[in-house]
Amino acid sequence: MNWIFNTLIQFLEDLNIDPSVVSLIDEDAKKLEEQFPKALKHPVVDEEIVYKILCEKYNLNALNVKTISETLNKEYKFGRNSKTALKKYLDYGKEEYLIQFFNTLMLENNTYIDREYIESVLAFCEPVSKEKIKNEFIKLWNEANEVNEYGKLKDYLLGIYSKLFSMGLENLRLIEIYNSNESLIKKVFKYESTIKELKEYCLSNQESITAGLAIKMFNEKYMELMKKEYQQDAIALKLEEHMNQLYVDNNINEYPYIFDRGNDILLLPTEEYDFVYFHIDQDFFNRFQDENKFLDYVLSSIKQIYRVLANEKVFALKIDNIYNNEKNLKWELYPKLTIYSEHFIQTKETARFYKAYDIAKDLLSKHEFRLLENDSEKNRENILKEYFSGKISEDELFSLVHVNMKKEHFFEFLNRFKYVHYGFTFNDCLVLDRVDKSFANGELENVISNATEILLIFYKFRADQRRIPCPSCGSLNISGNSYPEINNRSWECKSPYCPDRSKSNRGKRYSKKSNYMQWGAIYPKSHDIIPRELIKKWRRDIIVINNEQEIFEMLVKYFSFTDEKLLFINTNELPSVVTERENRKVVILSQKLKEKAYTSNVVVKESLEGEIEFFKNGLYLKNFTELYLPEDQRRVSPEINNFLNSGGRLKLIQGDSYEVLKSVEDNTFAAAVTSPPYYNAREYSQWPNLYLYFNDMYNIIKECFRTLKPGSVFLYNIADIVDNENIIVKSSMGNKRIPLGAYTIYFFQKAGFELLDNIIWDKGEPQSNRQKNDGKFTPHYQKPLNAYEHMFIFKKTGAPLTLSDDWQSKRGSWIKNIVPFQPVFKINSKGENILGHTAPFPEDIPRFVANVFTKHDNDIILDPFSGSLTSAIASYKSNRIGLGIELSPDYVELSRDRALLEGVTTKILNFN
């Protein structure tokens, strides 16, 4: 019997538990001992070691960590790494762990620390008693033992055994990790040469090193070879079409500067770069002199960027102010590039998480879809499931259902959902306030000054089912079919000797992305630590920028590690000032560097074009607008028009906004302003999926276009949100940041509106002072806090922009296209929000529209989603006629009461 069993038996006897129960883990222990026999040669002499292991597993020092960190937080930045190192010291009490804690704290703060003071704080910490640990274990043991749950008893014992076993493996050789995984390695890699290279690498590093470092080195080589095999398959054209490398230039990787003749991006190796920055500006646009050709080239470049960017890494896209015939294209490009980037890959999805029948069923609700017999929600789902799985034919399905669609339309519609549309994952839209520059602003040139640029951040998550080693033990004995994000697969370690098994002996859960983030945090190099000043500057998603290098510094520090290879495309300034200082390898692809650049001799016949078809005939966008709904009959309602023309300056129509607007005459309203219901973000706004949300919004937007006067404006306030689009999967794996602003612009323009500008509503400092970085100060953890909403200024075409005669004296603080003001909550003496509405917006917004973009006292200003009547009341106060449309009876009553508080009576028409 080895020292590990002896230690475990001694612990059980101390708790008066029959030590013979260790036989439950005999078989598992034997397997471990065969793989790593040397673990049995290093006995742990601390007789209390099992109690310390359990103290760690049960997180019993959590309160001590909290108390100490709060005390030290006055002097030091106390991140997640420092807390983890502190907990390890408190759990085990080893001097080496105390030194690790000091070093971690010093690294996170980038300064020397007062060790004597910190030790005095630690001295006041009350250690977790042996009795408390014992009672915790006995409680769990007895609960399982009383109902004969031998599986749990085995897990409890194996959890202790595996931790002791891993302690016997304080030092490892790489070949030991390889040997323990050899059979699985041969299943993961395709080529004998790859397996041979991995084994030779492990044999060439025969030195016994700390287990953590050995596992990290093994994993890094393993991931390098995974990339190498993938690149080989890309050149051999064995991958999906969008990932294959059609042209090869064996010399191109030797040069840091590359002159792109127009399509040389096709020569760059697949998944070669750990970060890609793509900059589009006026000079870039001028090479084309045609908006569609320019857009096609940019879209095609984004498609290639997806190919060349390493998986789970970041793509940053900077959009400058670009002019075509005096029209600023900046915010017009934003929706096209964002929507395309997220959805340009059309593919048939066979993964179990995608339920085409469920998504289609939601949209068919618009067509009175039902079964002719035994109709129920579940049976509708089942019949569609049978169709999508090929069990019934089109004719059979159509004979069993009622649906308000022609047969050919029905199946064209259904068959769209055999495909999903992937791409990058939208992460953020950062608004850059360029205090060093000012830009022209089209029709708003003299009204609102323009000082903004856009920086979009995307992640790439390409589905990759190949196993990756556990970061804690290096094992490939893993399983898992869950996804933190779509296409970002996570694994659970099944190795019984993994040191990071949980309280219930579950294995460590990890993904490729979490691995490189955690290793960067655990083994940070000096250039990987992000300075406190940089985090403070980029804390919010509206950032004052003085020069281009500030942008490079953030991108390099936030989204790359030391020695990684970064690709910059079409930069105005060289990023080498930052990249050389931060020890990154940089490649620049540009048409501006002819004199120093490498020009390939490989002739590329393919052209970067054809991607604009995504917007003309792509299936993805059809799902929002081409639903084959019956054409609505528009009938002008005398009742509504009499109501609009009657006396009174504050009016409210209770009814569905779309139905009301269909009944209004053309060219009725002088302006519109609203904050619509955000997709599933409030209790009053719930849609099954994003398709149906924007289908409803689009129909209302079209009616607003028809009923507005030519030259009038529509100010539309909306924010990007975190939610599930429910167009691929309905579980939490589908949760992501949804660029509602991008879709809003797209559908307004499709309805006929012209976008004049996006005025940024700066909502000030977020209520939380917490930086979203999980307490870590290394790459990929930083997340700026959302501090703004969009206020899009759309104009109905057909006439010059309508401006009031005295707009200059009435525009107030609306001088430039970033306007700061706080959200409004009117609180009474009882601390209650008397506006009642969960998302009220300031009267400054509709007042700005009334004062600047309308001319006459009898002008009607429309709010199609009235809420608590803010827009109509502000219009009334500006001596205009304010009209709200509101579906909810509760909000109609709230609006009436609110107006009375303002001393105004509301004229209300019920149009339900």
From Swiss-Prot:
GO terms for molecular function: DNA binding; N-methyltransferase activity; site-specific DNA-methyltransferase (cytosine-N4-specific) activity. Its EC number is 2.1.1.113. The keyword Transport does not apply. Belongs to the N(4)/N(6)-methyltransferase family. N(4) subfamily. This is Type II beta methyltransferase M.BslI. Keywords: DNA-binding, Methyltransferase, Restriction system, S-adenosyl-L-methionine, Transferase. It is an enzyme of class 2 (transferase). GO terms for biological process: DNA restriction-modification system; methylation. A beta subtype methylase. It catalyses: a 2'-deoxycytidine in DNA + S-adenosyl-L-methionine = an N(4)-methyl-2'-deoxycytidine in DNA + S-adenosyl-L-homocysteine + H(+).
